[in-house]
């Protein structure tokens, strides 16, 4: 079985064919050191990799950080991929996987394949993982693709070669921007910032939550950001009601900073005829990008499901 995986720092996004159907799965990344306790019917996911013990935990404030580029080659990345496979509904078996690297890692300074990083990623994902009292998948082959670029394949196929698409992929940790010619005849330019992503917002909001007596995991912080306009949700999940206003201000201010930095990057690109915005951070920045690029509406695209846009492209490439 061949499985297409966008192994981002915040979530693992998967797509595969099964029983004649295309299926998808999203698995948040949230791991801590040590094993979780067993109780009742609940089954903890307790893993061992490189002789170290880890467990999956969505709520602990002690979860290990994933918002750095070295995560791409870390034991946590391997665990995240295996955990997504194990929670996908697929029976453990031998699989081939297609994964991604941020543009700044996939390409070198001359915009050529960084073969050392690509091989490093492959070797990392081939490491053995064990699950306490359970079976795991055997990864028999790893293919590595760049982020951003594959997501534009559907749009580029319908454009003539004289046109070009600016593909803006904002993830949890990285911003990947590529300029691709119609029909995928050329990749004109790539840019990757490994320190610019939604985690900029997550970090600042987490600090505001700590001041509101609400220590929690990055997953729960991200859920607060997503539900920032839902007063009932905020009241239910922030321990100090008097601090809700401060948390909302922190969310708004950090999103504004994120938008400004993304627009600074986009301003350096010229000559594109179409724009496509993808990635988990797309809902936070798409409107600002639309206004900034001032391109006609029928040439500006936000993926219907921004988180899954890249795996759709990976599957289309094969």
Regions found by a protein language model. Name each.
Residues 171, 200-201:
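Extended, H/D-rich, highly charged conserved domains that either
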Residues 1-167, 184-199, 219, 223-318:
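Nucleotide/phosphate-binding catalytic cleft detector across ATP-hydrolyzing
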């Amino acid at each position: 079985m061949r499985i297409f995986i966008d192994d981002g720092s915040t979530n693992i996004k998967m797509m595969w064919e099964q029983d004649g159907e295309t299926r998808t799965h999203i698995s948040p990344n949230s791991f801590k050191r040590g094993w979780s306790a067993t109780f009742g019917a609940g089954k903890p996911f307790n893993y061992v990799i490189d002789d170290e013990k880890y467990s999956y935990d969505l709520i602990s404030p002690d979860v290990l950080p994933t918002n750095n580029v070295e995560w791409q080659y870390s034991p946590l990345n391997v665990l995240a991929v295996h955990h997504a496979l194990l929670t996908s509904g697929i029976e453990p078996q031998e699989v081939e996987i297609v994964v991604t690297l941020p543009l700044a890692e996939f390409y070198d300074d001359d915009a050529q394949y960084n073969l050392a990083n690509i091989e490093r990623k492959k070797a990392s994902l081939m490491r053995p993982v064990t699950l306490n009292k359970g079976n795991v998948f055997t990864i028999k082959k790893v293919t590595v693709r760049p982020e951003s670029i594959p997501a534009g394949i559907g749009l580029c196929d319908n454009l003539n070669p004289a046109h070009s698409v600016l593909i803006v992929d904002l993830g949890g940790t990285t911003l990947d921007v590529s300029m691709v010619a119609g029909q995928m005849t050329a990749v004109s330019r790539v840019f990757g910032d490994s320190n610019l992503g939604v985690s900029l917002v997550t970090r600042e909001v987490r600090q505001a939550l700590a001041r509101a007596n609400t220590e929690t995991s990055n997953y729960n912080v991200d859920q607060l950001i997503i539900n920032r306009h839902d007063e009932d949700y905020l009241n239910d999940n922030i321990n100090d009601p008097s601090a809700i206003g401060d948390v909302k201000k922190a969310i708004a201010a950090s999103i504004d900073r994120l938008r400004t930095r993304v627009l600074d990057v986009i301003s350096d690109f010229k000559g594109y005829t179409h724009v496509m915005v993808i990635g988990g951070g797309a809902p936070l920045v798409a409107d600002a990008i639309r206004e900034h690029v001032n391109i006609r509406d029928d040439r500006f695209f936000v993926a219907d499901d921004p988180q899954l846009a890249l795996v759709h492209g990976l599957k289309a490439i094969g």
